[in-house]
From Swiss-Prot:
Designated name of the protein: Dual-specificity RNA methyltransferase RlmN
Organism field: Cereibacter sphaeroides (strain ATCC 17023 / DSM 158 / JCM 6121 / CCUG 31486 / LMG 2827 / NBRC 12203 / NCIMB 8253 / ATH 2.4.1.)
Cofactor(s) the protein needs: [4Fe-4S] cluster
This protein's UniProt keywords: 4Fe-4S, Cytoplasm, Disulfide bond, Iron, Iron-sulfur, Metal-binding, Methyltransferase, rRNA processing, S-adenosyl-L-methionine, Transferase, tRNA processing
Keyword Ribosomal protein: no
Reaction(s) the record says it catalyses: adenosine(2503) in 23S rRNA + 2 reduced [2Fe-2S]-[ferredoxin] + 2 S-adenosyl-L-methionine = 2-methyladenosine(2503) in 23S rRNA + 5'-deoxyadenosine + L-methionine + 2 oxidized [2Fe-2S]-[ferredoxin] + S-adenosyl-L-homocysteine; adenosine(37) in tRNA + 2 reduced [2Fe-2S]-[ferredoxin] + 2 S-adenosyl-L-methionine = 2-methyladenosine(37) in tRNA + 5'-deoxyadenosine + L-methionine + 2 oxidized [2Fe-2S]-[ferredoxin] + S-adenosyl-L-homocysteine
């Protein structure tokens, strides 16, 4: 861990246009942006709202990637769309499937950069963990992603594209003319992959607008959870402009320990963070905030820590997710023992808070919480990485 690592950033987000003078990528445009783009391309204003709705449904409900297949649009209008627009997703480089069914995707985005996306199937639901940045600036000492330097923000298209690619892989797009199937393989989405979502607020917000739209991908805001290490100035804005569920990467009950585990705490300490959370359930219409707490042997797992945690979150509708530390090569910590984790959970439960212990998933493919890191960073430098680092 670098003690003086930067905790703010001024990073690049690639422009939405495809290679110089090329068509505009529709993926990731909000409805308002799509409507404006259609008008700019020559769609009569009186028709633009209807046309935007039709294109939206083809792309996000049916999963169509070819304008020629949008058969309720006139042929000349399909030609206009093909001239000015494209439907472009990131590229799946590799897919690994864990013994427990977890799927990890290495996804290549513009510039040759790579991020990881994880799908976790469970009985009755499936959760997709998406990334919001290439690398991370926060250098949390227990997190593998934190050892990879920040390269850039993902665009809204690259965030939405992760969900669309996984739906491709799972065969989840509906079949036209077939009976409607209400079963959702991807029923929940968590912004808990690589990066700090609130350091990429605008793109994350716009991506979630697309994901939550009822005529397309249609994931309810109650089934979307954004995890932040505590970017305090953006928390109220998250409630008002996104309104999804909120999870806090908390992990310590004193500033002394949290400064080491989550260095952003040096800027916004525990008291400041907790004060910013008290209005979130009301502003976002969410029931409670989730506090994520990774269990590190001899670091943050004492009975005194559990009692302090309960006292700190008093008055905030909460649940505490206890996360057994998922080790990675060179990690400076060890997982707390099962007995210690159970005792910690018992103190929290007796104080009146839900305290589920997360079952590690995908450990055999390095897909568990805190283990994500681009494969090119883990292993040799590939041509894609070299190109990325030189700005190509």
């Amino acid at each position: 861990m670098t003690a003086n690592a930067p905790i703010t950033q001024d990073v690049m987000t690639l422009p939405r246009k495809l290679p110089e003078g090329g068509p505009v990528n529709i993926v990731g445009l909000t409805r308002e942006e799509l409507l404006a783009a259609l008008v700019a391309a020559g769609t009569p204003e009186r028709q633009a709202k209807m046309r935007a709705g039709q294109v939206w449904q083809w792309v996000y409900h049916w999963g169509v990637r070819d304008f020629a297949q949008m058969t309720n649009l006139a042929k000349d209008y399909r030609a206009l769309l093909a001239e000015h627009f494209a439907i472009v997703l990131p590229e799946v480089v590799t897919r690994q499937i864990s013994a427990d069914g977890t799927r990890k995707y290495l996804i290549r985005i513009a510039g040759g950069h790579e991020v990881e996306t994880v799908y976790i199937p469970e009985e009755g639901r499936g959760t997709l963990c998406v990334s919001s940045q290439v690398g991370c600036t926060l250098t949390c000492s227990f997190c593998h992603t934190g050892t990879q330097k920040l390269v850039r923000n993902l665009t809204a298209a690259e965030i939405v594209g992760q969900l669309m690619l996984v739906r491709d892989d799972l065969g989840e797009w509906p079949e036209r003319g077939a009976p409607k199937d209400e079963t959702r393989l991807v029923s929940n989405l968590v912004l808990m992959g690589m990066g700090e979502p609130l350091y990429n607020f605008e793109n994350v917000r716009n991506a979630m607008k697309v994901v939550m739209d009822g005529e397309g991908l249609s994931l309810s805001r109650r089934r979307i959870t954004l995890s932040t290490s505590g970017v305090v100035p953006e928390i109220a804005r998250t409630a008002e402009e996104i309104g999804c569920q909120l999870a806090i990467s908390f992990h310590a009950t004193t500033d002394e320990v949290r400064d080491i585990l989550v260095p952003i705490n040096k800027r916004w300490n525990i008291r400041t963070l907790l004060d910013s959370l008290r209005d979130y359930p009301r502003l976002s219409n969410s029931e409670r905030i989730t506090f994520e707490y990774v269990m590190l042997d001899g670091v943050n797992d004492t009975d005194a820590d559990a009692r302090r945690l309960v006292k700190l979150i008093s008055g905030i509708p909460s649940k505490i997710n206890l996360i057994p530390f998922n080790e990675w090569p060179g990690a400076p910590y060890r997982r707390s023992t099962p007995e210690r984790i159970a005792a910690f959970a018992d103190i929290i439960y007796k104080a009146g808070y839900a305290s589920p212990i997360r079952t590690p998933r995908g450990e055999d493919i390095m897909a568990a919480c805190g283990q994500l890191k681009s494969a090119t960073e883990r292993a040799r430098k590939s041509r894609a990485q070299i190109a990325a680092e030189t700005g190509l």
